[in-house]
Swiss-Prot record:
Function: Catalyzes the attachment of proline to tRNA(Pro) in a two-step reaction: proline is first activated by ATP to form Pro-AMP and then transferred to the acceptor end of tRNA(Pro). As ProRS can inadvertently accommodate and process non-cognate amino acids such as alanine and cysteine, to avoid such errors it has two additional distinct editing activities against alanine. One activity is designated as 'pretransfer' editing and involves the tRNA(Pro)-independent hydrolysis of activated Ala-AMP.
Pfam families: HGTP_anticodon (PF03129), tRNA-synt_2b (PF00587), tRNA_edit (PF04073)
Top-level lineage group: Bacteria
Chemical reaction(s) catalysed: tRNA(Pro) + L-proline + ATP = L-prolyl-tRNA(Pro) + AMP + diphosphate
Oligomer status and interactors: Homodimer.
Signal peptide: none
Domain notes: Consists of three domains: the N-terminal catalytic domain, the editing domain and the C-terminal anticodon-binding domain.
CDD domains assigned to the protein according to its UniProt record, in alphabetical order: ProRS-INS (cd04334), ProRS_anticodon_short (cd00861)
Protein name in UniProt: Proline--tRNA ligase
EC number of the protein: 6.1.1.15
Keywords, alphabetical: Aminoacyl-tRNA synthetase, ATP-binding, Cytoplasm, Ligase, Nucleotide-binding, Protein biosynthesis
GO cellular-component term (any): cytosol
Organism: Prochlorococcus marinus (strain AS9601)
UniProt record similarity statement: Belongs to the class-II aminoacyl-tRNA synthetase family. ProS type 1 subfamily.
Length: 600
């Protein structure tokens, strides 16, 4: 392809102000994407070629394990999502689904995911165990109404995703296929030239018994990964479990009540009373908002040197009630407190806070649900707020009576924690970008959408189901996070828009011009993915653009063309070879094969 006729590069000299991370900056500067609105981007010709190459790698690998490609609608009727009980959660409050009504007033949503639609189709087309297992996938645009779109294609409102769905006759068959997909994903990411790590993950709004995320390790990642050096354990921080450090025991001579004037934080209490945060229980107020406007006030208790993991807390609360939990928010604002609570001793709240602090006129449930982290419940003696302003109290143990009382893991695991009492290995931490997520959904959707099959004995059973996602546009940007330098992008050759770019330094020179056309034609004949920069710009402009857009190889045609010699430059390591034109094709094929075979 020629730059002048097919690929107006549209490179920028200045870094766009809205771009916060290097990959976003380079995508914009190199002309791969153009911002249309917040979280909405146009994929320019170079970017589209990258997307197509990533998609081809995905298709090849999934087809090899028996998956079948299809295309599902993006506009979904609300009725399907109401059957799965996800409509309100995805559209109300901070829900991420764009939704609308048609001319007849019927509700629809723009799909962020396709579990409902594919399960509905499966219920109509799969009726016997003889048809199982089945796996379908698609690659298409998805929509999510992000509260704060940022980082370019990392968190956008419109993006390209591969989503796949499998159906099985048994849990064992699902688990077996899940591992096949996991292995296929590892091959896909290696073929894309990425360094990834698979981690245990929370299933979130998708649901299911277990799930695994695939992370690209990068400093710009929004997710934290906790792992052991040996590789025996790795998990997203939302899911990670560990043992907290040992607490420092309280001394016996501490009085039952401590006067703590104006000491509202754990640090202030510790500094003024010669205490350690591990000896104190902090209590945090949350409101759990369930479907049907059912609001439950929560007292979450955790050791003072630890932090609450709101994802774990959400999941634990969701098990307490048969209603669908829509939202969990920390109660901190004065207006909400004054409207719903009375005589609340902020900064001095204890785990035995009286239910009478909830106002009778409030639309909250009239008793606290108390959730205690293991780090707190394991303490035989501790200090917490005394439920009186300026006072803290020494508790012997969690012995107060409450029918709404639950002990569980609501703690953030952290770097330095041990993974078990049997293992001295400590957790390490690094940042990651999620590019893939796989789930064992079980029968969550088949039960609600009546997707059944007849087994060998003629019994009707619910289908077992898995789902598998890959962020196609995320892969492209994540690849840049791992492959760039001060000059620009350094694409892995497997997903680069072109394998090589030809750069003549002076097309007005007839010798250069003729040699350029000969090389270009020869590469096309040999099915090399080649871009010719045939602009009449200065050589320096072409070199800068070539470095910025990051095509793996450059063929530079300059003054030595009179001797039928050119330079072959490798963008990744900046090595240059001066080669006679009769050896150029052979040398390029050899060098590019080395790069193709060098997967991450």
């Amino acid at each position: 392809m020629r730059v002048t006729t097919s690929f107006p590069l549209g490179t920028l000299r200045d870094t766009p102000s809205e771009a916060e991370i290097i990959s976003h900056q380079l995508l914009l500067k190199a002309g791969y994407i153009r911002r249309v609105n917040s979280g909405i981007y146009a994929y320019m010709p170079l970017m589209l070629r990258v997307i197509e190459k990533i998609s081809a790698i995905i298709e090849k690998e999934l087809n090899s394990i028996g998956c079948t490609k299809l295309l599902l609608p993006q506009l979904h009727p609300a009725d399907l999502w109401k059957k799965s009980e996800r409509w309100e959660g995805y559209t109300a409050g901070e829900g991420i689904m764009f939704n609308l009504k048609d001319r007849q007033g019927k509700e629809f949503g723009l799909a962020p995911t396709h579990e409902e639609v594919i399960t509905s189709i499966a219920s109509e087309t799969i009726n016997s165990y003889k048809q199982l297992p089945q796996c379908f996938y698609q690659i298409q645009t998805k929509f999510r109404d992000e509260i704060r779109p940022r980082f370019g294609l990392m968190r956008s409102r419109e993006f390209i995703m591969k989503d796949g769905y499998s159906f099985h006759s048994s849990q064992n068959d699902l688990a077996s296929f899940y591992e096949k997909v996991s292995n296929a994903y590892e091959n896909i990411f290696k073929s894309c030239g990425l360094q990834t790590v698979g981690v245990e993950a929370d299933s979130g709004a998708i649901g299911g018994a277990s799930s695994k995320e695939f992370m690209v390790t990068a400093d710009a990642g929004e997710d934290s990964i906790l792992f052991t050096q040996s590789g025996s354990y790795a998990a997203n921080i939302e899911k990670a479990v560990s043992l907290p450090s040992q607490p420092i025991p309280l001394k016996d001579n501490i009085p039952e009540w401590l006067e703590t004037p104006h000491q509202k934080t754990i640090l202030e209490v510790c500094d003024n009373n010669n205490l350690d945060p591990s000896q104190i229980i902090k209590v945090v107020i949350f409101l759990a908002q369930f479907e049907g406007e059912f609001n439950v006030p929560i007292l979450a208790c955790i050791r003072g040197d630890q932090h609450i993991n709101e994802v774990k807390l959400f999941n634990l609360i969701n098990k307490l009630n048969h209603f669908n939990l829509l939202n969990l928010k920390k109660i901190e604002d004065k207006k909400t407190i004054e409207k719903n609570l009375v005589d609340l001793p902020l900064g001095f709240i204890g785990p035995d806070l009286d239910n009478n602090t909830i106002k009778a006129i409030s639309n909250w449930e009239k008793q606290w649900t108390r959730i205690i982290d293991h780090s707190a419940s394991d303490l035989s003696k501790f200090i917490s707020g005394g439920n009186k302003v300026n006072f803290h109290k020494v508790f012997q143990e969690f012995s107060f009576d409450s029918k709404d009382y639950l002990i569980g893991d609501i703690r953030n695991a952290k770097k330095g924690d041990k993974i078990s009492v049997y293992d001295d290995e400590e957790l390490k931490e690094k940042k990651g970008i999620e590019i893939g997520h796989i789930f064992q959904l079980g029968q969550k959707y088949s039960e609600k959408l009546n997707a059944k099959f007849s087994d060998k004995d003629g019994q009707l059973k619910n289908l077992w189901m898995g789902c598998y996602g890959i962020g196609v546009t995320r892969i492209a940007q994540a690849a840049i996070e791992q492959n760039h330098d001060q000059k620009g992008i350094c694409w892995p050759i497997h997903i680069s828009p072109f394998e090589v770019i030809i750069i003549p330094t002076n097309l007005k020179d007839p010798i250069q011009s003729d040699l350029t056309e000969q090389i270009y034609s020869n590469f096309l004949i040999n099915k090399i993915d080649v871009l010719l920069d045939d602009r009449n710009d200065r050589a320096g402009v072409k070199f800068k653009d070539a470095e910025l857009i990051g095509i793996p190889f450059q063929i530079i045609i300059g003054r030595d063309s009179i001797n039928k010699e050119v330079e072959l430059l490798c963008r990744t390591n900046n090595t240059k070879l001066k080669i006679s034109t009769d050896k150029l094709l052979e040398t390029f094929i050899s060098e590019s094969e080395i790069m193709y075979n060098k997967k991450s």
